[in-house]
């Protein structure tokens, strides 16, 4: 899987605007449309480009609070880790979940409309879970 400077520039342009046309991309890369399309297709087939997404404006959607919360589990056995990750996937407030090393097991990126909604989520969901020892 070799990525040359043209691929890197193409990827940068797609990260800025995933809706950019192949024609506009080709112009910016100083190549014709066919090789540009082939490069995009190859990068998708290799899994380098996994998907194209829309980046949403949280505030315009009324989701103004972002919190990074650290979590310790009651036990860190494989089954507990799987159960915790499955539980977290069911909550749209949690945008990202990362495994940590050190004193915390996970860090969560939580987005809510306001502080009260965040507090309710912590109290009624996270703190209520038998899987979580400490927040």
PLM region descriptions:
Residues 1-135:
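A compositional/biophysical signature of low hydrophobicity enriched in polar/charged and small residues
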């Amino acid at each position: 899987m070799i990525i040359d400077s043209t691929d890197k520039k193409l990827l940068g342009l797609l990260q800025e605007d995933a809706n950019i046309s192949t024609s506009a991309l080709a112009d910016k890369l100083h190549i014709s449309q066919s090789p540009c399309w082939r490069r995009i297709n190859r990068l998708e087939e290799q899994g380098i480009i996994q998907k194209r997404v829309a980046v949403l404006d949280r505030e315009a959607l009324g989701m103004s609070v972002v919190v990074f919360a650290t979590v310790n589990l009651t036990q860190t056995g494989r089954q507990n880790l799987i159960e915790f990750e499955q539980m977290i996937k069911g909550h749209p407030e949690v945008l990202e979940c990362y495994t940590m090393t050190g004193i915390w097991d996970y860090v969560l990126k939580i987005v809510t409309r306001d502080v009260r909604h965040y507090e309710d989520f912590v109290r009624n969901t996270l703190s209520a879970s038998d899987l979580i020892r400490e927040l």
